[in-house]
């Protein structure tokens, strides 16, 4: 599956999911020979997917592993090296774990965060699609 297809699927899922509620940029300390000019945005999207996966599950969205599945598609499309796959997964886990430390129950701020991340993730995916046609 091409990057554009994977990003389109992520964008559609982020836009169509029922909303409830800024992300840190992934670290770029590693030298990856497969690095792409859009990596900062891609790793940010990965982190958002992890955050959304955790928060929506916490708030009872009953989506199972949908967001993890979207991440698997992204890794399958963009994980062209072991280092790159590890960085993508690390970004997803960073989003998941970061919000797992902050939110233990579904609260109004958690719902607001979901809304923000759904919007931010959809915009980011759309931007990645547009810039990489």
Predicted regions and their residues:
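Bacterial N-terminal signal peptides that target proteins for export
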Residues: 1-6
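Cleavable N-terminal signal peptides
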Residues: 8-9, 19
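N-terminal secretory signal peptides
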Residues: 19-73, 122-133
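Compact alpha-helical subdomains of small soluble proteins
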Residues: 63-133
């Amino acid at each position: 599956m091409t990057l554009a297809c994977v990003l389109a699927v992520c964008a559609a899922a982020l836009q169509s999911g029922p909303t409830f509620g800024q992300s840190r940029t992934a670290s770029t300390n590693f030298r990856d020979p497969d690095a792409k000019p859009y990596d900062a945005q891609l790793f940010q999207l990965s982190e958002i997917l992890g955050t959304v996966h955790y928060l929506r599950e916490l708030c009872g969205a009953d989506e199972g592993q949908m967001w993890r599945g979207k991440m698997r598609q992204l890794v399958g499309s963009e994980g062209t090296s072991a280092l790159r796959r590890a960085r993508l997964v690390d970004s997803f886990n960073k989003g998941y774990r970061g919000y797992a430390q902050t939110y233990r129950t579904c609260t109004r701020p958690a719902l607001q965060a979901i809304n923000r991340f759904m919007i931010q993730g959809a915009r980011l995916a759309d931007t990645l699609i547009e810039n990489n046609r």
